[in-house]
């Protein structure tokens, strides 16, 4: 969609903030932390970051149990409040520098990012600026 708008209007559209929540789905016999580590690796690979560039923080905010920093500015929060569908919520947040880091580090477009989180991870965008 962004590519279409840019092409139609002849202007470059910049995303300066993106936040999305998505469910953490666990099977009965799965250990939460193992699933979380796999999910962090999966998201890191999509964003084109090495495992050494993903750091687990000692704290988290907004009632999430785990928080990771991907690169310098991309925040991933996991295992948050329980959703109506019985799963725990997760959140990805890219502020200004995180948005630029995504654009500069990846060969992917914003449409790729939206598709990954909204379709593949069944996410719900909470804010796009």
Q: What are the residue ranges of the model-derived segments?
A:
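Structured, helix-rich domain cores that form ligand/interaction pockets
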Residues: 1-129
């Amino acid at each position: 969609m962004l590519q279409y708008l840019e092409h139609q209007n002849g202007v470059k559209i910049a995303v300066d903030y993106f936040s999305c929540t998505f469910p953490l789905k666990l099977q009965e016999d799965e250990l939460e932390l193992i699933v979380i580590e796999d999910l962090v690796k999966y998201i890191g690979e999509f964003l084109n970051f090495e495992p050494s560039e993903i750091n687990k923080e000692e704290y988290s905010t907004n009632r999430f149990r785990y928080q990771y920093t991907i690169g310098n500015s991309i925040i991933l929060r996991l295992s948050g409040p329980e959703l109506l569908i019985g799963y725990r919520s997760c959140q990805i947040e890219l502020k200004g520098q995180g948005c630029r880091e995504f654009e500069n580090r990846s060969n992917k477009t914003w449409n790729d990012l939206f598709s990954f989180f909204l379709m593949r991870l069944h996410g719900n965008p909470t804010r796009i600026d």
